[in-house]
């Protein structure tokens, strides 16, 4: 009978090193440049709220998350003014939640953009969104050769 071996494995983040790394990146990119801290998968297991707190302390006010629930979790943790970008499209029924939480969605088709626009109009809120362009992998996003469909979402 095979029994899977158990081993101790973990990941730790040194906040002092993270702080140093952020300062180094900011120095390299220069003043006035926007940096977005990616916090997908609970900051890759390091704790999104903990990492976002260090990012905010270093003047980074834009965060990328993979899912709607990750974005909502950051809002509920007190990240109310920062831009939170949902890096993957969400189904149209969730447009109201995106708008209520003032999250910045990625849109990859007209139907998705229209649902978010209608939800924002209904709530009287302007939402900043990002248009996803398919860069050749064929996973998601507008085809850059189809500029007419991209124009439709303006």
Model regions: which residues?
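Alpha-helical packing segments of well-folded alpha/beta enzyme cores
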Residues: 18-21, 25
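Conserved PLP-enzyme active-site core in the AAT-like
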Residues: 28
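Active-site-proximal beta-alpha core segment in soluble small-molecule metabolic enzymes
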Residues: 2-5, 9-12, 20, 33-154
């Amino acid at each position: 009978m095979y029994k899977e071996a158990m081993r101790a494995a973990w990941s730790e983040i040194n906040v002092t090193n993270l702080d140093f790394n952020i300062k180094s990146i900011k120095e390299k990119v220069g003043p006035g440049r926007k940096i977005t801290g990616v916090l997908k998968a609970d900051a890759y297991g390091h704790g999104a709220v903990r990492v976002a707190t260090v990012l905010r302390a270093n003047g980074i006010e834009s965060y990328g998350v993979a899912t709607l629930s990750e974005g909502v979790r950051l809002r509920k943790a007190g990240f109310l003014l920062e831009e939170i970008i949902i890096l993957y499209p969400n189904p149209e029924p969730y447009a109201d939640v995106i708008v209520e939480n003032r999250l910045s969605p990625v849109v990859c088709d007209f139907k998705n953009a229209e649902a978010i626009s209608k939800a924002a109009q209904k709530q009287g809120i302007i939402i900043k969104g990002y248009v996803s362009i398919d860069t050749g992998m064929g996973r998601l996003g507008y085809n850059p050769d189809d500029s007419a469909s991209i124009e439709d979402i303006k």
